[in-house]
Structure formats: C-alpha cells, structure tokens
Amino acid sequence: MAIGLLVLFSASYARAYYETKNAASVFVNQLIFAVMGIGVMWLISRVPYEWYQKLSLLILAASIGLLVLVPFIGTESGGATRWLDFGFVSFQPSEIAKFGVICSFAAIMAAHTRDMKTIRYGVAPYVVILGIIAVLLYLEPHMSATLIILALGFILMTLGGTDWKYLVGLVILGCLLVAVYLLTKGYTGGRISAWLHPENDPLDKGLQVLQSQYAIGS
C-alpha cells in the first residue's frame, strides 16, 4: 500500500499542482481513504467468521439487488454507469459483490465439502451466481470488475475442490464469453489500443498509462 501511494504521488503531483496549486492533494485524498480502509479491515477482522457464514446469502442477495439498481439510478461517468450515489455516500456495488461471492461460495463449500466433485454442488451454484453477477456487470458495463469476480470465483472453486474437468470447461467458456464481450462493447477496443499506444491520446485514454510510465521512470 505504501509503495502504491508513493507511485501515485509521483504520477500525480505535477497535474495536481497545475489544477489545485497543491501537489499533494491527490496523495492526501487517497491516504485518507487508505487509513479508513485499514480501519474497516480491522473492524471486519474482529467479527466472528460464523456471522459471515450465516449472513452469506443475505450479503450476496443485497449485492445483486444493488447491481440491479445501477442501470436505473446509477451515476454515469466515462460512458459507463457503475456508481450508486446516495448523497452521503457513493460506491460501486461491484465491490460489495466481490465480498458477497467470497462469503456465499465459502458457505456453500463448507456445507457440501464431500460433494464438491459433483456438478450439483461443485459447479452449478457457483456458475449461477457468477452468471447473474456477470450479466448485471455487462449492462453497466464494467469489464474489469467482471474479470476480477470471475477469476475470484474460479480460484475459490479450485481451492474448494471442484473437479478439474469442470474447471477446464469453465475456462474455455469464460474465454469465449470474454471474446463476445470485447466484440460487443466497442469501448474496450479503444482502451486496449490506448494501453498499447498511449502516446496517440496522451490527454484522455492514454493519460493514466503515460503517467504510470512517468512514475516508473522518475
């Protein structure tokens, strides 16, 4: 985290000073959130894990419910609608969905440890959960969160004992779905191009990549 904050400061201080006359404004803002995040992590770690097991399906249902709300009342930014803004707080429901996937997967696996080699308990419930979340994220659209959650689900299934034959099939299916996503969402092609050739659009799509390169170079 410390290294990330230092890299952020190195990449943002010039632009921050140009816009706000305070070179550390972006750094300080992120530092505050980092400290708050550590506090939340500590509080969560103090909660008995049995509580998460009992509330796992409720957490998952709440996260899916929030994702359903995004297309209707979400805040649009950069051509995508990913945030919910309730005035006193704004957040991306996809972050809660990640937590919901972890809790629900762990609870199901703990209850059916001996049946993880079967389709019914080793594949079906997880594919249904990931499928619902992936479709809702597709509507936003939110490619990065989709990939993270799918990868997270795959890792949990692997650790949980899902048969490798099913895992290979899911990887193939996942690659096909990602290909379809890239073909149907035009903005992703622009982002890939900006990643490969950031100098072609240094003030917009290529800005973050170039600033990261400046940070590494300095």
Feature annotation, model-predicted:
Residues 77-83, 166-218:
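Hydrophobic, glycine- and aromatic-enriched re-entrant/interface helices and adjoining loop segments
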Residues 109, 113, 138-139, 157-159, ...:
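Hydrophobic residues in alpha-helical segments
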Residues 6-141, 202, 209:
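Membrane-helix boundary/helix-loop-helix interface segments in multi-pass membrane proteins
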Residues 1-7, 176:
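N-terminal signal-anchor transmembrane alpha helix
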Residues 57-60, 64, 120-136, 143-183:
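Hydrophobic alpha-helical segments of polytopic membrane proteins
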Residues 3, 36, 73, 160, ...:
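Short glycine-rich loop/turn motifs that provide flexible caps or phosphate-binding loops at active sites
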